Amino acid sequence: MTKDLLLELGLEELPAYVVTPSEKQLGQKMVKFLEDHRLSFETVQTFSTPRRLAVRVKGLADQQTDLTEDFKGPSKKIALDAEGNFSKAAQGFVRGKGLSVDDIEFREVKGEEYVYVTKHETGKSAIDVLASVTEVLTELTFPVNMHWANNSFEYIRPVHTLVVLLDDQALELDFLDIHSGRISRGHRFLGSDTEISSASSYEDDLRQQFVIADAKERQQMIVNQIHAIEEKKNISVEIDEDLLNEVLNLVEYPTAFLGSFDEKYLDVPEEVLVTSMKNHQRYFVVRDRDGKLLPNFISVRNGNAEHIENVIKGNEKVLVARLEDGEFFWQEDQKLNIADLVEKLKQVTFHEKIGSLYEHMDRVKVISQYLAEKADLSDEEKLAVLRAASIYKFDLLTGMVDEFDELQGIMGEKYALLAGEQPAVAAAIREHYMPTSADGELPETRVGAILALADKFDTLLSFFSVGLIPSGSNDPYALRRATQGIVRILEAFGWDIPLDELVTNLYGLSFASLDYANQKEVMAFISARIEKMIGSKVPKDIREAVLESDTYIVSLILEASQALVQKSKDAQYKVSVESLSRAFNLAEKVTHSVLVDSSLFENNQEKALYQAILSLELTEDMHDNLDKLFALSPIINDFFDNTMVMTDDEKMKQNRLALLNSLVAKARTVAAFNLLNTK
């Protein structure tokens, strides 16, 4: 016989970003609890609103499964003393299992007898096991916790209710300072406390109190309501997924509505309006069917449609205050002078250990010129890079960016154009922040890409130089994101600049404001970002092999990893890799540089391998390079079958090692083949 279990925790309003991850955690913890306690079940369904986290288990067994376990103990010679009595070791072993020496039997394992005991445990009733089910709530982890009242414990938010039902039976349990029952809270304004009749009636009972417990249902309600407004008003609404996920976790009973604002604010840059609505007010942006921004917005109320006109007016009033600020800053910032703002950056700290933003820009200016040369930019582009690097942080001191920091770079571009800067310069000011996430948009222009690289390189090297190196998951200065951006930009723009050479040359630059340090750590950090870019779907041994190659060009490293993944499916992969790996391992025994002397060859296999290596011409086509290297496998194996490399003749040995080393030197431009797994 099976039953349904419901566990609901009622809390003060949770931060929106915590709700969905916590709901997911709760489901995972419940599954683990049931599996660990040998309670079978059919399905687990989770629920969440800003004021509750809940999980329902359907088809829960009424009793644990019985358990029979065999335990292996000490060997017989240790378990018995000289008189044939059970030793203290044997007695201690069975006592630890809750058994006695009468339960001991001996079993032979690989020719030797060992103590074995078999423990039988009859399954407990589900009611008894569920006495500790609140463990799943204790085990939930949150970004931050809080204390309340005079309690010694802490949790994400104060807890008000706990409901634990097995079908319609309320279980008597405690969690923190709350005793369980069947009382749950309805909507804060429209509902009231309500009894949950049974685990199966959970959603319906709460719906009567204006609470939609299922997040997916709430989300669909919002989407349907927005679509209905779209159809009625002949408009188009941007349903941003992140915003939708946030909004659904701000409401328990959603009602979408259309608001408006004065058309005069459309003279303010669109980005300001969108940021005000979307980021600050959690409103959905409204456009006409051609994509033109309209003086409207859609918001979602936490409640029903009653007195919705008052809610609309209130939301419009709040938004207008934001738009007034935007309009004011837009007009006032245009009175500022870029040169004056750049000069003031001398007083703005980049980091207390590193210096000012002005000094950061000075270093970026030098780095960007070096990179522009390496990337073979035109003279016109180089001039644009130089100008952009000289001013690109000025907008940080504008009123608009101070109020809306999400618009840094975006407003810089607009103000630069108004001040008469070249479009390439203005675009670079915006693009130097790109990408802003692991899969964010990249710069579109070469000038912007070079400035982005220079800014990110100086940021990386500066923080590493003063010892501010990320550890574990801690990365307060977003250096991983900056480095990922470097790798992505180099690959996307096809700038095949070897990273080891590039970083070494950057470390060779001299600045009065800062001396770069920790080059080795920087290179390791960059390699880790390249590995991240290669992706976890590529086997770990392949990732390691290409990162340990002598190739430091991002695009070639990525291509080599894909080529190896493709080749690993071939029947000859194992044989080819093993032959090259053997050469790699022997080449490590080279103690000093020796030129291959063909006059010392004793057999045709040495000559054949020597000629094959001389004829081996590798290019920047990693797939072709692998084909050529794998084609050598029969020649390499023939060499090993007929040649003693580690001969007693020292001169002969060093010559053969040098021969293999010449092969490895070429092969290592693709991968360190000895790191590949062929088992």
UniProtKB/Swiss-Prot annotation:
Cross-referenced Pfam families: DALR_1, tRNA_synt_2f
Record flagged with keyword Ribosomal protein: no
A GO BP entry: glycyl-tRNA aminoacylation
Single GO cellular component term: cytosol
Catalytic activity: tRNA(Gly) + glycine + ATP = glycyl-tRNA(Gly) + AMP + diphosphate
PANTHER family reported for this sequence: GLYCINE--TRNA LIGASE, CHLOROPLASTIC_MITOCHONDRIAL 2, GLYCYL-TRNA SYNTHETASE
Name listed for the protein in its UniProt record: Glycine--tRNA ligase beta subunit
